[in-house]
Structures are given as structure tokens and as C-alpha cells.
């Protein structure tokens, strides 16, 4: 008899595996007793008990971080506590039980359970209940589920609504043998499995399941505690995951047309920051059974070329799918394969082919996966909340590093301190007090002496000393930061410590291509002693200057340099990838050290403008200059509209630059995202001083204040009402909704050649029980619409003139 849970996917999975396992233990003549090994890992002994059955069933349902030896015992109450620690809900009455619950009965003298089983539903007779139970030989030999009275009930545990991903979901070859064919031992701890490979090398898979978001994360850590080199590690995929997906629909002519909304599976791949009109574009790729696709980044920078964030959507009604993130700040490659009824995802480090040295240890890429069943928009909003609350340093540290990205005015580092403060006096005297940061970019360090915009723009790349230039800043910038802090503002300072110019300063060990003409070199941060030197060198500047936001650039493509260092280290080619791995590990260690030393510090991840945006960097920083496209003078507003909407699909926190020209509301609002820096007074020449461009200060006061007041919404839930487009004859519109306060904004643009005065949109996040008052931020006019009306009819937006914007805020009444 087969029973399924009426309301839960995981409950159904638990019942399915319970039935299969109970049939197996009956047919293979298992006996009751204490198994020497958790049968979820190895059941060759054919010994089973009540708790080992539950262990085995839960493992098959995806709860894999279990002890290898013996398993979780029911007494103690070890199994009960384990369930609650893993997001199960405690059930305290028999009347509340649902099929798939783990039931605990027969209390001992301490009140702890002595017996457990899988509940399978109420029986036909009063007081009788179905169960899967291996508590004695008679039950093991029977056909289950059995129907028995439920006596001495203590409690039950119900699995969370989102199934965890079964890990370890990784693959590699070791000495030519695939991981799943190696003779290994496994030791399970609370959040990790430690595998000991045949030669003593240890692989530790650390896992985390975040129930609030349905996210599973894991990282793989390698250690060679032996006195000899390891076998060759190759074909390393830190994520190798196959997930069930519905079979393809029939291959009809219509389903092959790209103008038709397909019911086929789609893989969504995002562009990185490539300094062009298409930055962060998300492109769907239809994949039929047998199709294969692979993508990679460029030149060793994780967000250059292709971004390491992916989505697979099942097809059909498009409600089911999975979001994934590859956590590696170096070179990566991703492979995707469509099966008949499944989909395989692999995240690899393609450069790795190495033997570990004695005593060597490192970690490789992390994997983050989030299955979803409520559609793409809901999934990406849950992802945004996950990044905002559980990943980003702003969310994780509960506001110690701020709660929003900065609103800044940017200045070149060669503007003398006295003049910089004079410019700020001018900015503030015109009522432009919405800024919360002064952003100082390149050019503030020794040995520079240039005094014009042209020469400073040419000389800034002479880096390496990381000493404040006393020619420009006699007091070492401390007078500037004191000035700012007294006025409630903060100070952001640019660095590029991984690159060093040999003609300037050879302050530490470095790597290079070997060419005498190669003046820019890569410091050898992969060496622990170099990393330690860097931590001290940069920490000294942060402390002495009073830096609030540390901005790290990286104008260097490191892959070729890493590969040369690997060849130099081992001409036999058995250390490929080692230099890169240690560089990335110590880059993370460097940032972690700064965050630990300076609890207030925010880190800005630049890397040539968005070239290293990955989930590992997002866990330590925010990208405040998302693309060097913003280096373009008064860059195209439509590109900013598109870029902001495309990036919002994955990142709640990010920023771009604007300007220098002020006065165009359409263009300025096109730059609205969670962080912005204004370029109007950026450079050294006199025309860049406050008032030098005849700035419209009244306009600036109004719209700077508008942006600062509404900025927080751009980190909330995002709804693409009219998707981004590369044509100029359309509208684009987005909604940002604050779930906690049931308020938000709608930002819409009618482009320059668009003939339509009105657009009809369907809003997200609306509560049918509430009424919403909308306010036009240009006219001040308000109107009220019932939630039921908004959900039934949507909302009509009106922009009377071409190349104009509409900004509506709303709240409940």
C-alpha cells in the first residue's frame, strides 16, 4: 500500500523513500540491530533499526549531513534535536500529524524518546495509524506501511517545505579515478563531511541550508596532511548537480519559433560588465534533450565576459526552476546538459591539474543553489532578499557598515586637500546636503606630481607605494576626513594593491610574464607572508586617514601571469591552477582581515568596473561602480535604464556613476539604483570647481534629495513591469516594493521615439485587502486605488511627452 502526502513535496518524497527502503530491507532479509555504519552510506551489513530507517529515509530525501558511523540515534534525544536544528517543525499533538512526519514515542525516565518511525496517515478504524517502522524483526519482514495504534506519543518533526540539495554534489578525478569510484572513508559532522582519500589527503565539504530562502550552499576544502605529494587532481567541478526536470514538449514547428513563448526548458545566462551597451544582459537559451552548453569568464576575472550567476527554468508554465551561483573570483567554466527528464549543472575550475604539496591546504569554489516553484519573479525577489540579508556585509552585520549603498560625489585623488574641502563648502552652501560620502578615486599616492586633468589622467597608473602624497595632502587626508565626519559624511578611498608598477616601487614579491617591457606586475599575494604584508600596509592607511569605505580596483588580467608561474614552479605541468587558487584564497583572506579589523568598514569591489562580481565577493563587498561604461561622459541614459534593471535581477546592492552634466531629470532618474556617485566636480582643472559649469543648483537640490529619500527602495523587491529594451520606440518601467511596509515606487520612462502616451502594467506585491495611495513625485498629485482593483485591472501609467520619466511612490491607507 502506497500513501503520499497531500500537501507537501518533501513529505511525499519521504513516504516514497520509506516505501522503497522498507521493501528493500524485507526482500534482502535485513535483521533488527545496531548497524555499524549508517545504512544511508553503506548497508552491506543488512542490519536496521527504527532510527537507522529514519536516517536512511531522510538521507534519500536530501538531508545528507548525517554521521557516517552508526547514524543518529533516537535516544538522547539526538535525532529529535537534529531534526529541529535542520529546520523541521515540532508537532505536539497526534491530531496535527501529516503523512511524512517523523514520530517519536515511548518516553524514557528523562522524557526522551525510545522509538521513532515515519508516519503514513490515519487508518480506517478509529485510533489506528499507518507507519513505516523497523523497530523489530516482525515489522522488517512485513509489507509496509503497517496499521497500528499510536501509543505513548511524545512529538513529531515535520520536514521544511523546501527540499535541501543533496551534497556532496561535486566531481573530480584523483590519480585518474573518478571521485565516486575511489575507496574513501567519510566522517560526518554537524555541517560537514570529511572524506579521506586513499593516500591520506582530506576533502572537507562544508554545507549550509538556509531554510528561510530555500538555499543550499557548500564549499570544498582540501588538505594534504601527509609528507608526500598527492595524486593528480583534475576535472574539478565543485558543483556537479543533476536535478529532475519535466521532459520536453513535442517538437512542433511552433515550439521552435523564437517569436513564440516556448514551453521548453530555458537556461538563462547573464553577461558580465563588458563596458558596452549590453552590460548584465540576461539571455535565455532553449535547451532540448541532448543539448549541451558551456560558458566561461575571461582572463581570470570572475565577472568579465560572462557573470557567474545562472538560472534554469523548467518550461511548461515556467513556475519551476533553479538559481545557481558559482563562487570563484578567478577563472571558471560552467557546463549545462539537458537530459530526457533532468538537467545537469557543473561549475568547474578549468585550469586545475595539480598535485598537492605536503602540508598544503586550500579551498576551491563555493556553490549556491536555490530551487523555486513559484515563478521567476518571485524566485529572484527571494534571491535578492537572500543576498541582502544573509550574504551582503551590510545585511549580515545589521547596519554596522550601513544599510544602503553610498550616495557620493567623486573627486580625483590629485585635487589638493584644501581645494577638496573648499569644493565641499561650495556644494553644501548650495543646499546639496543629500550626499553621505566623499569618494576619492585614483591619484592620491606617491610619487605623483601632476596638477592638470590631462596629466593626472595619464599618471594615475603609477601605483605601488600606498603612501598618502604629501605634495597634494600635507596632512595626510586627516584634515579632510575630520571635516567630513564633523558634517555627518563619510570618506571613500581608491586602492589597487594587487597591481604594482615596477618603475615606481618594488615593495614585495611579485609575478610577471617575463617580458622586460612588462612594467605592471602582480604581487604574489598567494604567499602568506606577502598577504600579511599587504594587510598591514593597507590597514595602516585606513587607520591613519580614517577611511570609511575601502575601494579596490583591479586593472589587470591575471590568468596568463598565473599560468606562467605554474609552469615555472613545475615544468612537468603538475601544479596547474595552484598559483590562481592561492591568490584567490589570500585575496579573500585579505578582505576578511580588513572587515575584522575595521567593524565599520565597507568594501567597494571595482576591478575595472564590475569585472569581479561573484557571490564570494558579494559576501565581502558591494560593487559601487558596476561598469566602466559610466566612465563615458554623460553616458546614454537608456543604457543606464537597461543596466539597472538587468543587474537588479541578481543584485539588490550596486551602484553606478552619473554625469558630469546636471539638469536633465530623465537622464538623472535613469541612473537610479541603490548607489550613485555624481561626477560633476571630479577633476582638477578650474572648470571642475563648484559653479564652474553653471550647474542648476535648485534642480540639483530637488532631485538629489529625491534620490536620497527613495534610494532604499532599490534594494527591496524588484518587478520588471516593462522589461529593458535596446530600442528607442518603447517604454521601460520597474517597480520596487518594500514588503515590510507595503510601500514602494514605480519608475517609468517613455523613450525619445516612443509614440505611446500610456502604458498598462501589472504590479507585484499588492495586498488585495488594502487601499494604495499613489503620489506623482513631479506634480505632487495623489490618487487612491483598491488592492483588488490593482490585481484585477493593473495600473495605467501616463507620460504626455516623449523622452520623459514618471516616478510614482505608493503606500497603504
Explain the meaning of each model-derived region.
Residues 168, 174-180, 186, 587-782, ...:
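Active-site-proximal substrate-binding groove within the catalytic cores of carbohydrate-active enzymes
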Residues 354-373, 803-811:
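Short Pro-Gly-centered flexible turn/kink motifs
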Residues 402-536, 545, 549, 559-561, ...:
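Aromatic-lined carbohydrate-binding/catalytic grooves of carbohydrate-active enzymes
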Residues 8, 12-15, 63-142:
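...with weaker cross-activation on analogous glycine-rich loops/strands in unrelated enzymes
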Residues 164-340, 350-352, 771-784:
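Polysaccharide-binding surfaces and accessory modules of carbohydrate-active proteins
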Residues 786-813:
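C-terminal beta-strand-rich structural cap/linker in extracellular carbohydrate-active enzymes
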